[in-house]
A protein has these predicted regions:
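S-adenosyl-L-methionine-dependent methyltransferase catalytic core, i.e., the SAM/SAH-binding region
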Residues: 1-93
Length: 93
């Protein structure tokens, strides 16, 4: 299941990051983006507004498939990180 894989990947990547390290996640579907956004809200204490980058109008004209893409940049603020269960992100398996 793609949602489970994304969830596991976010937890593993964040566990490997040092403090102030950043990861970038590209999503193409709203359900994936919701999981990434909810994960971000759990791990980012100070800066709840993460960097969200959407394709420009020019990019969409030259590449119509890009219109649904969202790039989120997430920074690890703390040294300690605890695994976040998928149920805490609003998803049930």
């Amino acid at each position: 299941n793609e949602i489970q894989e994304l969830h596991a990947g976010l937890n593993q990547a964040f566990n490997l990051l040092r403090a102030n390290g950043k990861i970038c996640v590209v999503t193409f579907h709203s359900i994936e983006d919701r999981l990434v956004k909810n994960f971000t809200n759990k791990v980012c204490l100070r800066n709840k507004k993460t960097k969200l980058i959407k394709p420009s109008s020019k990019e969409i004209l030259s590449n119509p498939r890009s219109r649904s893409a969202k790039l989120r940049v997430i920074m690890r603020e703390q040294l300690n990180f605890n695994y976040i269960p998928i149920s805490e992100l609003g998803f049930e398996l």
